[in-house]
Amino acid sequence: MRGLLQRVRGARVEVAGEVVGAIDQGLLVLVAVEPEDSREQADKLLHKLLNYRVFSDEQGKMNLSLKDVGGGLLLVSQFTLAADTRNGMRPSFSTAAPPALGAELFDYLLQQAKAQYADVASGRFGADMQVHLVNDGPVTFMLQI
């Protein structure tokens, strides 16, 4: 499972012109599910997202987590992150989970996030989405679980 974590000052996701998820300061995370992933990987990714220290403390050091700052968590499914880009001029998606598994694990991740944290929003799995964000820093990390 992969999560592209971006620290944001604000972000929103639209589907067909309608805002389906939005946060103020926090983390926008693009999530890709891979064929061998399970709920265990989703649990590990969520733990890392809530506790990864990417927000600055009073001394300007990245020492605070999402939980510490009380920011929002916006989860957006993006199977293209699992693409194999090593060969040729076209990405291969054979390294991405089948849609049914991707939907199941993304939904599990989202439900666990909502159960463990108050400020959670999401895009819509499989939809054509427009993601708007104000990247803070920019601070971006690829998490591979």
From Swiss-Prot:
Disulfide bonds: none annotated. GO terms for cellular component: cytoplasm. GO terms for biological process: D-amino acid catabolic process. SUPFAM superfamilies: DTD-like (SSF69500). It holds the Pfam family Tyr_Deacylase. CDD domains: Dtyr_deacylase (cd00563). Keywords: Cytoplasm, Hydrolase, RNA-binding, tRNA-binding. GO terms for molecular function: D-tyrosyl-tRNA(Tyr) deacylase activity; Gly-tRNA(Ala) deacylase activity; Ser(Gly)-tRNA(Ala) hydrolase activity; tRNA binding. Its EC number is 3.1.1.96. A motif (Gly-cisPro motif, important for rejection of L-amino acids) lies at residues 137-138. It is found in: Cytoplasm. Belongs to the DTD family. Homodimer. An aminoacyl-tRNA editing enzyme that deacylates mischarged D-aminoacyl-tRNAs. Also deacylates mischarged glycyl-tRNA(Ala), protecting cells against glycine mischarging by AlaRS. Acts via tRNA-based rather than protein-based catalysis; rejects L-amino acids rather than detecting D-amino acids in the active site. By recycling D-aminoacyl-tRNA to D-amino acids and free tRNA molecules, this enzyme counteracts the toxicity associated with the formation of D-aminoacyl-tRNA entities in vivo and helps enforce protein L-homochirality. A Gly-cisPro motif from one monomer fits into the active site of the other monomer to allow specific chiral rejection of L-amino acids. This is D-aminoacyl-tRNA deacylase. The gene is dtd.
